[in-house]
Structure formats: C-alpha cells, structure tokens
Amino acid sequence: MRIYQCHFCSSPCYPGHGIMFVRNDAKEFRFCRSKCHKAFKQRRNPRKLKWTKAFRKAAGKELAVDSTLTFAQRRNVPVRYNRELVATTLKAMARIEEIRQKRERAFYKNRMRGNKEKDFLRDKKLVESNPELLRIREVEIARKLAKEQERAESVSEQEESEEEEEDMEIDSDEEEEEQLEKQKILLKNRRRNTKKIAF
C-alpha cells in the first residue's frame, strides 16, 4: 500500500482518499482534502499558512534538518530483489522511526524550555505597569471568601433546621404518647362509671 503526501500541506493521502490533479506536462499533484485543492488553485503559498507542515518547518517549529529525514527521500535507482536486503531494510525502518520520534520529542522540549520564565516575566511586567489588576484580584478574593462564608452559613442553618425538626418530631411523639395514655385512663374511668350505674 503506497501512502502519498499531500502536495500542499504534506499530510498523508491514503488510498481512495483525496484528489489528484494532473497538469498538461503530466505532473501529478495529490491533495488530502478539498481545502488543500482550493488553496492550490488560488495559488496560495503553503509557507504562509500556519496549518501546513511547510510553515511549521520554515518557522522552526518542527525538526527540519536531521539525518533520519533523509531516509524518506525517493531514489530512482532500480535495485534487484534480495530477501535479506528487504528484511534488514524493514528492521532499519522501524529503528529509524523510533530514533526520529525521540529526536522530535527532544527538539520540542528544547523549544519549550524557557516558556515558563518568559510567561512569568511578562505577567510581572503587566502587573507592574497596571497595579489596578492587583486590586481587582483582591476584590475577586474577597468575593470568593464571602461566597464561601455564605455557603458555610447556609449549611449550618440547614443543620440547625434539621436538628429542630428532629426535636419537634421527638416532642410530637411524646405528646402523642401522653394523649394515648390520657385516652386509656378516660376509657377506664368510663367503664367504672358504667359499672356503678348498672348496679
């Protein structure tokens, strides 16, 4: 399976995907999607569009000069088939890919190394030039604290109300028991009275 590169953005064009344009001089141009095809027809420069690989390499955002990248170049030299050569080539391809990924990671880490310090210095300068930002921050912190206090108060009020409800329930249970006892006493008295009247 042959995977071609998009002529415009350099992303992979898989079989059955994308568009191929053949010019009058029989040169083939493959595009991964209509976006790239339209940009090519408008004669746009891929180095000036931030989403293309050409821009990223030109701007120094990706590894552009490395020995691992030379292996991907096409060589129009016919080679006689040799089973051992194919096996060693496949092993080498896997190893080269590993090395390339490691180097890309190292390149990215090296590129991002001083970003935290730069961000800190930029923020510091911004605060020094605009001291009112600190006051805004203080106001935000005060609001946060007020909100937290309100929440704590509401939670405590809920707990108190629950306790009061429990106490009320206990009191109501006691009252019901007392009423039942009174009713029992009244019933006993009535029975006694009825017995006396019968005699």
Swiss-Prot record:
Q: Please give the SUPFAM superfamilies that the UniProt record associates with this protein.
A: Glucocorticoid receptor-like (DNA-binding domain)
Positions of post-translational Phosphoserine modification: S172
InterPro entries registered for this protein in UniProt: L24e/L24_sf, Ribosomal_eL24, Ribosomal_eL24-rel_N, TRASH_dom
State any GO CC term: nucleolus
Where are stretches of biased composition, namely Acidic residues?
A: 156-179
Q: Describe the family membership recorded for this protein in Swiss-Prot or TrEMBL.
A: Belongs to the eukaryotic ribosomal protein eL24 family.
**Annotated protein name in UniProt:** Ribosome biogenesis protein RLP24
